[in-house]
C-alpha cells in the first residue's frame, strides 16, 4: 500500500455510515493522485445474478456527465449512418468496422450503438465486444433506430450500470474536480435509477452496502437508508 493511500485511509472511519455528501466530500479529499481522479460508486445489491429474473441493468444520464470525453461507434447504414455522423458519432460504418475490430483487435471507442437491422452483423462480434461490456443492448438504449438521440445522451453523460457476478454495481459518477455538490447530484441520479430497477424477484434488503471512492483512494461507506435524502 502506498503512503498516500495510508494517509487518506486515516481520514475515513471504516465503521461509520456517512450521508452521500459526507462520503463524497471524503472521496474528493482522499483523491491524492496528480491527475483528476474519477469518483466511483460501488453498490452491493440483494440479488442473485445467476437468475435471469434478478439481473439489474440499465442506463441513466448523469446531470453533470462523467467528465470523460466519450467516443461513440455506431453500426448503421444509409440514412441512419448519415444521422449518426450528423449527431457527432466518432465512428460510423457496417461490415468494414466488423472486419477492422476482428482483424486489428481495435477498441478505440467507449460505447457501441447499433440500429436493430444491424444486430445480425454486430452479433458476429459477441465474443469480442461482450467481455469488454461493449455489446449494444436494448435495455441500455444502445440498440435503437433513434441513433441521434442515443449519441446525444451518451455524449451528455449517460452511463450504463450492470450488476456483476458478485452482485455489485461499479459505476463512475464524475471527477474529483466536479466538487461535492455536483457529485451528490450525479450520485442521486444513479441511485434513483438503481432503486427503480429493483427486480420483482429480489427478496429482502435490496441495497446491501453503498460506498464511494476515488480511483486510487479508499472507500467511504454511505448509509443505504439515506442514499436519496
From Swiss-Prot:
UniProt GO BP: regulation of translation; translation
Domain of life of the source: Bacteria
Alphabetized GO MF terms: rRNA binding; structural constituent of ribosome; tRNA binding
InterPro entries assigned: Ribosom_uL1_bac-type, Ribosomal_uL1, Ribosomal_uL1-like, Ribosomal_uL1/biogenesis, Ribosomal_uL1_3-a/b-sand, Ribosomal_uL1_CS
Gene Ontology cellular component annotations, sorted alphabetically: large ribosomal subunit
Keywords on record: Repressor, Ribonucleoprotein, Ribosomal protein, RNA-binding, rRNA-binding, Translation regulation, tRNA-binding
The keyword rRNA-binding is assigned to this record: yes
Subunit: Part of the 50S ribosomal subunit.
Record function comment: Binds directly to 23S rRNA. The L1 stalk is quite mobile in the ribosome, and is involved in E site tRNA release.
Record-stated family: Belongs to the universal ribosomal protein uL1 family.
Protein name per the record: Large ribosomal subunit protein uL1
Underlying gene: rplA
Amino acid at each position: 500500500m502506498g503512503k498516500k493511500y495510508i494517509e487518506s485511509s486515516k481520514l475515513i472511519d471504516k465503521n461509520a455510515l456517512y450521508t452521500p455528501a459526507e462520503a463524497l466530500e471524503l472521496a474528493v479529499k482522499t483523491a491524492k493522485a496528480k491527475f483528476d481522479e474519477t469518483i466511483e460508486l460501488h453498490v452491493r445489491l440483494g440479488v442473485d445474478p445467476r437468475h435471469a429474473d434478478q439481473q439489474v441493468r440499465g442506463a441513466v444520464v448523469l446531470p453533470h456527465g462523467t467528465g470523460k470525453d466519450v467516443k461513440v461507434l455506431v453500426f448503421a447504414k444509409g440514412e441512419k449512418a448519415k444521422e449518426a455522423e450528423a449527431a457527432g458519432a466518432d465512428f460510423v460504418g457496417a461490415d468494414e468496422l466488423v472486419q477492422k475490430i476482428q482483424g486489428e483487435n481495435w477498441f478505440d471507442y467507449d460505447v457501441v450503438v447499433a440500429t436493430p437491422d444491424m444486430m445480425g452483423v454486430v452479433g458476429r462480434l459477441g465474443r469480442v465486444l461482450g467481455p469488454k461490456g461493449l455489446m449494444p443492448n436494448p435495455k441500455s438504449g444502445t440498440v435503437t433506430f433513434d441513433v441521434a438521440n442515443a449519441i446525444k445522451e451518451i455524449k451528455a453523460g449517460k452511463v450504463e450500470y450492470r450488476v456483476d457476478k458478485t452482485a455489485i454495481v461499479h459505476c463512475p459518477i464524475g471527477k474529483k474536480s466536479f466538487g461535492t455538490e455536483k457529485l451528490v447530484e450525479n450520485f442521486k441520479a444513479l441511485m434513483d435509477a438503481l432503486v427503480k430497477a429493483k427486480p420483482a424477484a429480489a427478496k429482502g434488503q435490496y441495497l446491501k452496502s453503498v460506498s464511494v471512492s476515488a480511483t486510487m483512494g479508499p472507500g467511504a461507506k454511505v448509509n443505504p437508508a439515506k442514499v436519496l435524502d
